[in-house]
Amino acid sequence: MKISFQKVLLNKRFPLKISRFVSSSCYNVFIKVEKDGIIGWGESAPAEKGAKTADEIITELEKLIKTNISNKSISEIEQISRELKISPCSYAGLDIALWDWKAKKANMPLHALLGLPIPKTKTSLTIGIMSPESVKERIPLLFHNSTAKYLKVKLGSPDGIDTDKLMYEQVLESSKKYNLGLRVDANGGWNTEEAKYMIEWL
């Protein structure tokens, strides 16, 4: 089994602002597993806990590969990963690639290989912290011709919960026509009292 990595710069369609920073791009790692003429693909994304960069992901996975995992089962590889304390965000991409390879080898969709029904998970899109005026523009751009049924709303503005409330009120108004389920993520932008208040308000 040959395992290789490719670090790829992914540019976001729109910069994403959360309570702690603004992100317009990121490096992810695409993982390729080759064996018997079949290729499995996976993707790992850095996380705040564990491997914080694409390079750290590659370093961790190279450490795992050096344990000679070629003839191990997926469950055995996962156990070795846990013993080596490989970050979940790093291992996830390799796990995906291994299962992708296994399903292709069996010439079956992965859900069928696992004995599961066709997945019916509804896609969610995310909107970052922004002004109500920007919300008016952004939501139609995101959901025009989209099959997504949920919108995750980033709150926790450095300008305070009154700013969050104005933004969220505009989200409610602008999302009506799309019949969306809404989720809120403040990313640690509220203290305990603010969180209690906003939970009630929302």
Positions of PLM-derived features:
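Short hydrophobic-acidic sequence motifs that mark active-site Asp/Glu residues
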Residues: 30, 36, 41, 150, ...
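Residues at beta-strand starts and edge strands
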Residues: 27-29, 38, 119-121
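Conserved active-site and cofactor/substrate-binding residues in soluble primary-metabolism enzymes
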Residues: 25-26, 52, 72, 85, ...
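Metal-dependent enolase-superfamily TIM-barrel catalytic cores that perform enediolate-based chemistry
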Residues: 112-202
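Metal- or metallocofactor-binding catalytic centers and their adjacent structured scaffolds
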Residues: 5, 33-34, 38-106
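Short, Gly/Pro- and small/polar-rich lid/capping loops
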Residues: 1-27
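Generic structural signal for residues positioned in beta-strands
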Residues: 2-4, 30, 122-124
